[in-house]
C-alpha cells in the first residue's frame, strides 16, 4: 500500500509540474491571434513595384555602423561602408527593436507577418511548423526567397498558395560551425544571380519576375553562424559583415540594371542580434537591437539635423547629424506592405513608420488610417469572442471614454476638412490616428488577458494544494508510518463535486481551452485529499516537531523563511547564494561537531563552492581550467581507490582504474579538439570519434560492467557514479564547469560524513529531535538543488549555455542532439545530488525517499513565488528573467521527482558498510 501511495505521488507530481510549467504561457503569454478579419489594403498608389528584404541573421546594430578595429589586420574602419554611405546619402535608418525570445523564428515572423508570436513559439521548430497566420509574403504577387532551410519553409509551406513563394535552400550540412560562414551567404547571392540569368532565356520567368508586387527575400545566415562559432568580435564575424556589404552594393547595381526603372525598394535589417558570448535568445540589448536601413522607391532620404543627437550607444557611429528613426520589429511588415501596395497582413500589429515614407502628408494619412483600421478589425473580432464567452462583459476603459467609432468619425471629419484645403490639420489627423492605433493595441492586450484573475486563482490553489498534499503524504508515510487509505466522506464528495461542476461550467461558458480544465483538476484533487486527511496532518505535524520548544520553533521558522527568501533573491543576484553557502560553512560547529580537520575542510570546500556563483555564468572557453579540473578528478579518484582498496574486489578495482583512464583519455581528446578549433583548423576526426567513444563507453558499458558484479559499499558506488559522468562533464565544459563538478562532489561527500557524525552525537545524547536534523538536511538539500544549476548556469539569459563545448562532438548545426548534450550537462549535478540524498537516507537510518519527499513538498514555494513575479511589461531582459526563473523553479521540483527514482536505482542494495564489504563483490 505504501508503494502505491508513493507511485501515485510521483505520477501526479510529474503530471502536475509538466502541466503547470506550461500554465504561464496560457495565462501570461497567450497569443492574441484571431481569424475572420476583413483585410485592409495599405494604399491604392504604391510607390514601389517590387521590394528586396535583406536579413543579416544575427547581425548587431553597433557592428553594422561602428568603426571597428579588425583583430587580424589591426586596421580601424567601418565594416559596412556601402550601407553606411546609403545612411548618409540615400536612406532612412534606425534601430529595429526586437522582442524576446530573440530567436530566428519569432524574429522573422515579427518582421514578415507583423505579429509577435507568444514566447512558446520558440519551441515549435521551423520547417516542421510553418506559420499559421497571414504574412507579407502571402499578400505579394510572388515571393522569391533564398537562404536557410530553417527559415524559408515556414513561409513557403505556410502561404495560402505554396506556389506563390519559391525557395532556394542549401542543405543542413552547410551549417558547419567549424567552416567558413561566408559560403552560406555566397549561396544566396549566387542563386539570385542565376535566377536573373535564367530569365534571359525563359520569357515566362522573365515576365513573372518583372510583374508588380513581387518580393525578394534574402536570408543571410553567415553572421549568426560566425557569431555562434567564434563570437561577434571575431575576425570571422567581421569578415562576414564586410562580405555582406560588398554583395549588397553589387546587388543594388544588378537590380538597377536588370529592371531599369528605379522602382525597387530595399529593406536591410536583422532578425536578432548577438551577445558578446555568441548566443542569443534573451532580452539583452545586444540581442534586441538590430540595424534597419531602407532606401529606394517610396522611401525617404536622410534628414540632416542642425543640432547633432548623441547617446552612449551610438556615439561611435559618427552619424549624430543624421536623424535616427527607431521602430519595433513588427513595424517592418507594415512598411513593406505600404511600399508595394499589398494588404496589411491580417494579424499584423505593426505601426506604419511614417518617418521612412516619402510622400505627402495626405498619402501618409491614408496609409496610416488603413493601418489603424486593420488593427481595429482585430480588436472587434477579439472583443466579440470575449463578449460571447462572458456572463458579464466590461468594455476596455479607454474605449468606454471614447469609442472606436468616435475616433474614426473624428479622423474622417479632419480628412474632409483637409480635402477642402485645410492642410494644416494633417498633423492633427495623423496624431489622432496614431493614438487610435496605440489605444487599440492596448485594448487587444486587455482582451487577451481578460480572464487572468480567474485562471490565476485556480493555478494558485493548485500550487498550494500540491505543497500541502505532498507534505501530507510525507507525514503519512515517513513520520506516522501510516499506509492505510482514508476514504472521503459523503460531505467531502458532495462539496468538491459541486464545486467542480460549477467551475467547469464557468470554463465551458468562457470557451476556455482544454488546458484550463486540466489546471482545475489538480486543485480539486489535492484539496479533496487534504480535507479527508486533516487528522493525519495534525498528528504528523505534532510527531515531526516533537521535542522542539516554541522558541526553537520560531528560530527554525525564521531560518527557513530567510533561506527561502535568499534563494528567491539569489535567482536575480547569484552572489546571495554565495553568502548562504558561506553561512552553511559553520553549521557543523553549531551542531556540536568539534573535530578541527573536519570543520576546516568543510569551511574550505564551502568557500570553494561559493566562488562559482560569483563567477560570470556566461563563459569564455578556457582550456587550462578544463585541464586542471581533469587532473583533480583523476587524482581524487585514484586517491579514493587507494583508500577503498581494502573494501573492493580486484574486479571492481580494475573497472575503476579503467574509468580513471577514460577520464584521462577524454581530457586528451578535449584538449586536442579545443586547440584545433581555436586555430580554425576544424574538428579533428580522431578527436571527435574518440570523444564520442569515451562518452558512450562511460555512460553505458562501464555502468553495465559494474552491474554484473556490484559493490554495495556506498562510498564505492558514489565513486563509480562520479567517474561515470566525469568524462561527459569534461568534454562539455567551456571553462570552470568541470572544477565545479569536482568541488560539488567533494561537498556532497563531506556533507554525508558530517550529518552522520551529528546523528551519532545526538544518539549518544539521546536527543529526541530527529525532526530537526531531517528538516535541516532537507533545506540544505533543497539549496544544493539550486546550486546544481547556478554553479554553472544563469537564468539572466536563457541562452547562457554556449555551444562551444558541443562543437567538440557535433560541428554541424543540429539543434536536437546539441540540446540533448546540453541537457545532459545540466542534469548531471542533479543526479549526483539525488544519489547523495539517497545515501543520506542510509546514513541517517531512515526510509528511502524520506529526504527527497520532504524537499519535494516544499520546493514549489519557489514556483509560486515566481508565478506572481512574472512580468509581461518592461524591458525584455526583465521579462525573460522572470520566465526563466519560473521554469527553473518548477523544473527543479520535476527533476527531484524523476531523479529520486534514478538515484534509487543507482543506489540499489547499497549499505553503510565500509570495512566489512567482502572483496568477492
From Swiss-Prot:
Subcellular location: Endoplasmic reticulum membrane
Alphabetized SUPFAM superfamilies for the sequence: Alkaline phosphatase-like (SSF53649)
Pathway note: Glycolipid biosynthesis; glycosylphosphatidylinositol-anchor biosynthesis
Keywords tagged on the record: Cell wall biogenesis/degradation, Endoplasmic reticulum, Glycoprotein, GPI-anchor biosynthesis, Membrane, Transferase, Transmembrane, Transmembrane helix
Main location: endoplasmic reticulum
Glycosylation positions in this chain: 90, 138, 198, 262, 286, 909
The UniProt record lists the keyword Transmembrane helix: yes
A GO MF term: mannose-ethanolamine phosphotransferase activity
One of the record's GO cellular component terms: endoplasmic reticulum membrane
Membrane topology of the entry: Multi-pass membrane protein
Ranges of the Cytoplasmic topological domain: 1-9, 479-488, 538-552, 597-599, 643-654, 706-728, 799-819, 871-878
Topological domain spans for side Lumenal: 31-457, 510-516, 574-575, 621, 676-684, 750-777, 841-849, 900-921
Source superkingdom: Eukaryota
Pfam family, any one: Phosphodiest
Top EC class of this enzyme: transferase
TM segment ranges: 10-30, 458-478, 489-509, 517-537, 553-573, 576-596, 600-620, 622-642, 655-675, 685-705, 729-749, 778-798, 820-840, 850-870, 879-899
Enzyme Commission numbers on file: 2.-.-.-
Biological processes per GO annotation: ATP transport; cell wall organization; GPI anchor biosynthetic process
Keyword Protease: no
Functional summary from the UniProt entry: Ethanolamine phosphate transferase involved in glycosylphosphatidylinositol-anchor biosynthesis. Transfers ethanolamine phosphate to the first alpha-1,4-linked mannose of the glycosylphosphatidylinositol precursor of GPI-anchor.
Family: Belongs to the PIGG/PIGN/PIGO family. PIGN subfamily.
Name of the molecule in the record: GPI ethanolamine phosphate transferase 1
Organism: Candida glabrata (strain ATCC 2001 / BCRC 20586 / JCM 3761 / NBRC 0622 / NRRL Y-65 / CBS 138)
Encoding gene per record: MCD4
Amino acid at each position: 500500500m505504501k508503494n502505491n501511495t508513493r507511485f501515485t505521488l510521483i505520477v501526479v507530481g510529474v503530471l502536475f509540474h509538466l502541466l503547470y510549467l506550461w500554465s504561464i504561457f496560457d495565462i501570461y503569454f497567450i497569443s492574441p491571434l484571431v481569424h475572420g478579419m476583413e483585410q485592409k489594403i495599405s494604399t491604392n498608389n504604391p510607390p514601389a513595384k517590387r521590394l528586396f528584404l535583406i536579413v543579416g541573421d544575427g547581425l548587431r546594430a553597433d557592428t553594422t555602423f561602428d568603426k571597428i578595429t579588425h583583430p587580424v589586420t589591426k586596421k580601424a574602419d567601418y565594416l559596412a561602408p556601402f550601407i553606411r554611405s546609403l545612411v548618409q546619402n540615400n536612406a532612412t535608418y534606425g534601430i529595429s527593436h526586437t522582442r524576446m525570445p530573440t530567436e530566428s523564428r519569432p524574429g522573422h515572423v515579427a518582421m514578415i507577418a507583423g505579429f509577435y508570436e507568444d514566447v512558446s513559439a520558440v519551441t515549435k521548430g521551423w520547417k516542421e511548423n510553418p506559420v499559421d497566420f497571414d504574412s507579407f509574403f502571402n499578400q505579394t504577387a510572388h515571393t522569391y526567397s533564398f537562404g536557410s532551410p530553417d527559415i524559408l519553409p515556414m513561409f513557403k509551406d505556410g502561404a495560402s498558395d505554396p506556389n506563390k513563394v519559391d525557395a532556394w535552400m542549401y542543405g543542413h550540412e552547410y551549417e558547419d560551425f567549424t567552416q567558413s560562414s561566408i559560403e552560406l551567404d555566397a549561396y544566396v547571392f549566387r542563386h539570385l544571380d542565376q535566377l536573373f540569368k535564367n530569365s534571359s532565356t525563359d520569357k515566362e520567368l522573365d515576365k513573372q519576375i518583372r510583374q508588380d508586387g513581387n518580393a525578394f527575400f534574402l536570408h543571410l545566415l553567415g553572421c549568426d553562424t560566425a557569431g555562434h562559432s567564434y563570437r561577434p568580435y571575431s575576425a570571422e564575424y567581421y569578415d562576414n559583415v564586410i562580405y555582406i556589404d560588398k554583395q549588397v552594393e553589387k546587388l543594388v547595381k544588378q537590380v538597377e540594371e536588370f529592371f531599369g526603372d528605379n522602382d525597387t525598394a530595399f529593406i536591410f535589417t536583422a532578425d536578432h542580434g548577438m551577445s558578446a558570448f555568441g548566443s542569443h535568445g534573451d532580452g539583452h540589448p545586444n540581442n534586441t537591437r538590430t540595424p534597419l536601413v531602407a532606401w529606394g522607391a517610396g522611401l525617404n532620404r536622410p534628414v540632416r539635423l542642425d543640432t547633432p543627437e548623441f547617446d552612449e550607444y551610438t556615439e561611435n557611429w559618427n552619424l549624430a547629424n543624421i536623424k535616427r528613426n527607431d521602430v519595433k520589429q513588427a513595424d517592418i511588415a507594415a512598411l513593406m506592405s505600404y511600399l508595394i501596395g499589398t494588404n496589411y497582413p491580417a494579424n499584423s500589429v505593426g505601426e506604419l513608420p511614417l518617418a521612412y515614407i516619402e510622400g505627402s502628408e495626405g498619402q501618409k494619412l491614408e496609409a496610416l488610417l488603413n493601418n489603424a483600421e486593420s488593427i481595429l478589425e482585430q480588436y472587434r473580432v477579439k472583443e466579440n469572442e470575449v463578449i460571447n464567452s462572458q456572463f458579464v462583459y466590461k468594455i476596455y476603459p479607454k474605449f468606454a471614454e471614447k469609442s472606436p467609432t468616435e475616433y474614426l468619425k473624428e479622423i474622417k471629419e479632419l480628412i474632409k476638412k483637409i480635402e477642402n484645403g485645410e492642410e494644416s490639420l494633417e498633423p492633427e489627423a495623423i496624431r489622432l490616428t496614431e493614438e487610435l492605433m496605440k489605444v487599440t493595441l492596448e485594448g487587444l492586450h486587455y482582451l487577451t488577458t481578460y480572464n487572468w484573475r480567474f485562471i490565476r486563482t485556480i493555478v494558485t490553489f493548485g500550487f498550494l494544494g500540491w505543497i500541502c498534499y505532498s507534505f501530507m503524504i510525507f507525514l503519512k508515510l515517513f513520520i506516522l508510518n501510516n499506509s492505510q487509505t482514508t476514504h472521503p466522506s459523503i460531505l467531502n464528495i458532495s462539496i468538491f463535486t459541486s464545486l467542480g461542476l460549477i467551475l467547469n461550467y464557468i470554463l465551458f461558458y468562457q470557451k476556455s481551452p482544454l488546458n484550463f480544465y486540466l489546471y482545475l483538476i489538480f486543485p480539486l484533487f489535492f484539496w479533496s485529499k487534504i480535507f479527508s486527511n486533516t487528522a493525519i496532518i495534525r498528528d504528523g505535524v505534532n510527531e515531526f516537531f516533537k521535542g522542539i520548544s516554541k522558541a526553537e520553533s520560531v528560530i527554525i521558522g525564521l531560518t527557513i523563511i530567510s533561506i527561502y527568501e535568499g534563494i528567491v533573491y539569489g535567482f536575480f543576484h547569484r552572489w546571495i547564494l554565495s553568502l548562504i553557502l558561506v553561512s552553511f560553512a559553520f553549521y557543523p560547529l553549531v551542531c556540536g561537531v568539534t573535530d578541527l580537520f573536519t570543520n576546516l575542510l568543510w569551511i574550505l570546500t564551502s568557500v570553494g563552492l561559493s566562488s562559482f556563483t560569483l563567477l560570470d555564468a556566461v563563459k569564455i572557453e578556457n582550456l587550462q581550467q578544463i585541464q586542471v579540473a581533469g587532473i583533480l578528478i583523476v587524482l581524487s579518484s585514484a586517491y579514493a581507490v587507494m583508500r577503498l582498496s581494502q573494501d573492493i574486489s580486484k574486479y571492481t578495482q580494475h573497472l575503476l582504474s579503467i574509468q580513471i583512464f577514460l577520464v584521462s583519455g577524454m581530457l586528451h581528446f578535449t584538449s586536442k579538439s579545443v586547440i584545433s578549433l581555436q586555430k580554425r583548423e576544424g574538428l579533428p576526426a580522431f578527436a571527435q570519434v574518440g570523444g564520442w567513444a569515451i562518452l558512450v563507453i562511460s555512460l553505458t558499458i562501464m555502468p553495465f560492467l559494474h552491474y554484473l558484479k556490484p559493490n554495495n559499499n556506498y562510498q564505492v558506488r558514489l565513486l563509480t557514479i562520479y567517474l561515470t559522468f566525469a568524462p561527459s562533464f569534461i568534454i562539455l565544459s567551456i571553462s570552470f564547469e568541470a572544477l565545479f563538478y569536482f568541488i560539488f562532489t567533494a561537498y556532497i561527500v563531506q556533507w554525508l560524513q558530517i550529518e552522520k557524525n551529528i546523528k551519532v552525537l545526538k544518539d549518544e545524547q539521546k536527543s529526541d529531535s530527529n525532526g530537526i536534523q531531517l528538516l535541516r538536511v532537507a533545506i540544505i538539500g533543497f539549496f544544493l538543488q539550486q546550486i546544481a544549476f547556478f554553479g554553472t548556469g544563469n537564468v539572466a539569459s536563457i541562452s547562457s549555455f554556449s555551444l562551444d563545448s558541443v562543437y567538440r562532438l557535433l560541428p554541424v548545426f543540429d539543434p536536437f542532439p546539441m540540446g540533448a548534450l546540453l541537457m545532459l550537462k545540466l542534469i548531471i549535478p542533479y543526479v549526483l545530488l539525488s544519489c547523495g540524498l539517497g545515501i543520506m537516507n542510509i546514513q541517517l537510518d531512515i526510509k528511502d525517499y524520506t529526504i527527497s519527499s520532504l524537499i519535494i513538498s516544499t520546493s514549489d514555494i519557489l514556483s509560486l513565488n515566481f508565478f506572481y513575479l512574472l512580468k509581461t511589461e518592461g524591458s525584455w531582459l526583465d521579462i525573460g528573467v522572470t520566465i526563466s526563473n519560473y521554469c527553473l523553479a518548477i523544473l527543479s521540483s520535476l527533476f527531484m521527482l524523476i531523479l529520486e527514482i534514478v538515484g534509487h536505482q543507482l543506489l540499489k542494495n547499497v549499505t553503510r558498510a565500509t570495512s566489512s564489504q567482502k572483496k568477492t563483490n
